[in-house]
């Protein structure tokens, strides 16, 4: 086993470990991530080789890079001592490679050219014989430093808290600009409830979306999860009860943009299967239709309530059954708009878990977001199903509420997990009511 240094993003740090665990599991990599610290962007791990390191980090959204670790210490001097102990077994393969040095600081001030040159010159004992190539090096030897911000003046301490030296093995998609590329405002089509780009991509990694997999979002909206799925190679399919959201506006309106335009914009149109207008609680998909992965953000009921087909006005419903237009029952006409009624989110989630238990293959994943009130005295009960193992509960905090990303894995018939139905959750999980009453 070899030591590697992970350089992580300080964005959503409580999601980082779970994302790496999911990617490690996807590629069959055994790695101990128990040293993960949410307050630090650096973590040392042990892997068998560079190929494992590349697979672990390449598509990670909350990691920046991974380095073959050559040495580290509490200051530059101690770091050099450690590198000198290891150099004989590390330098040989790269002695004649074209190279460059990179110096990175976390929370520290960028060093002057003179300071950088001094640090680079201090590595002459490595005996590197290759040419320095700043444009297209074969190897990038990197010094990474972390600093503490002083409370007195909010400036970094003059000296680093710790230093690492390593050889760059792999940059992540984050370092290649994927989060910025999928920024909502850059898309041809988006809406008020469009899910943020960064966590859409993270969610798809936790769902283990892979090349050629069938991905389904039953509450597709403006399609953030499908776009992210297509980026990772999945075939994207979805449904939504809102026809206008799927089509981008009313028929006949000029210059309408819709989800398909976003796929064209990102060059992933070949991964776009289709989206259909459907009430998920009255699913029109075949019973034997298998789905590899389900990723979604069910309607919470803050900006948009939870709607299903139906009506609470029984008199109107009876009238609809008998009304004819041009000799045709009104509910059979193409221009008929199905009435909708509100239901609780818990009602929807039970259907979602049962759907996943029926349709996913063993090992397939269901990932969805669920809101919760930030009430210390009232815990939120998480939906459970006996065939689905809940492996991650990840929280994104807001002011008076939070949302949780729940990650389930479908297990075989021998697994008999816990079931928590909507009847058990209903009293504690009435999120919409508590949100608009300020959780009082």
Report the location of each language-model feature.
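A broadly used, surface-exposed interaction patch
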Residues: 58, 62-88
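Short amphipathic alpha-helix with an adjacent loop that forms part of the alpha/beta core around
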Residues: 82-93, 283-290
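Class I S-adenosyl-L-methionine-dependent methyltransferase catalytic core
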Residues: 1-60, 65, 78, 107-110, ...
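Residues that form generic nucleotide/phosphate-binding pockets
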Residues: 23, 79-89, 122, 126, ...
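A short N-terminal interaction module
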Residues: 88-152, 156, 163
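A short, well-structured beta->alpha microelement
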Residues: 29-30, 82, 130-133
């Amino acid at each position: 086993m070899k030591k590697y240094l992970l350089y992580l993003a300080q964005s959503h740090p409580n999601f980082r470990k779970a994302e790496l665990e999911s990617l490690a599991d996807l590629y069959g990599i055994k790695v101990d991530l128990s040293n993960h610290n949410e307050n630090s962007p650096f973590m040392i791990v042990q892997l068998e080789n560079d190929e494992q390191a590349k697979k672990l980090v390449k598509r990670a959204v909350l990691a920046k890079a991974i380095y073959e670790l050559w040495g580290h210490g509490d200051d530059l001097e101690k770091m050099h001592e450690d590198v000198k102990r290891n150099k004989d077994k590390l330098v040989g393969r790269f002695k004649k490679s074209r190279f460059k040095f990179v110096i990175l600081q976390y929370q520290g001030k960028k060093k002057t050219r003179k300071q950088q040159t001094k640090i680079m010159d201090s590595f002459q004992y490595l005996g590197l014989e290759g040419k320095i190539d700043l444009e297209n090096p074969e190897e990038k030897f990197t010094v990474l430093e972390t600093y503490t911000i002083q409370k007195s003046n909010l400036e970094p301490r003059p000296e680093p808290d710790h230093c690492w030296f390593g050889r760059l093995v792999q940059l992540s998609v984050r370092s290649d600009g994927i989060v910025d590329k999928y920024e909502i405002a850059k898309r041809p089509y988006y809406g008020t409830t469009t899910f943020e780009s960064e966590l859409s991509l993270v969610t798809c990694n936790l769902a283990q979306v892979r090349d050629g997999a069938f991905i389904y979002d039953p509450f597709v909206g403006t399609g953030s999860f499908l776009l992210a799925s297509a980026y990772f190679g999945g075939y994207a399919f979805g449904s939504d009860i809102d026809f206008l959201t799927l089509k981008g506006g009313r028929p006949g309106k000029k210059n309408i943009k819709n989800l398909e335009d976003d796929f064209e914009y990102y060059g992933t149109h070949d991964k776009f299967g289709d989206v259909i207008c459907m009430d998920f609680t009255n699913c029109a998909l075949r019973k034997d239709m298998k789905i590899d992965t389900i990723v979604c953000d069910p309607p919470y009921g803050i900006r948009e309530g939870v709607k299903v087909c139906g009506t609470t006005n029984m008199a109107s419903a009876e009238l609809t059954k008998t009304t004819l237009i041009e000799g045709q029952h009104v509910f059979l006409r193409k221009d008929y708009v199905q009435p909708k009624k509100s239901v609780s989110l818990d009602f929807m989630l039970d259907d979602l878990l049962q759907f996943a238990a029926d349709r996913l293959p063993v090992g397939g994943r269901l990932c969805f977001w669920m809101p919760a009130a930030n009430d210390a005295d009232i815990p939120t009960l998480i939906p459970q199903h006996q065939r689905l193992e809940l492996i991650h509960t990840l929280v994104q905090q807001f002011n008076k509420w939070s949302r949780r990303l729940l990650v389930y894995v479908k297990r075989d018939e021998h697994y008999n997990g816990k079931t928590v139905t909507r009847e058990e959750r209903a009293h504690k999980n009435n999120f919409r009511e508590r949100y608009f009453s300020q959780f009082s």
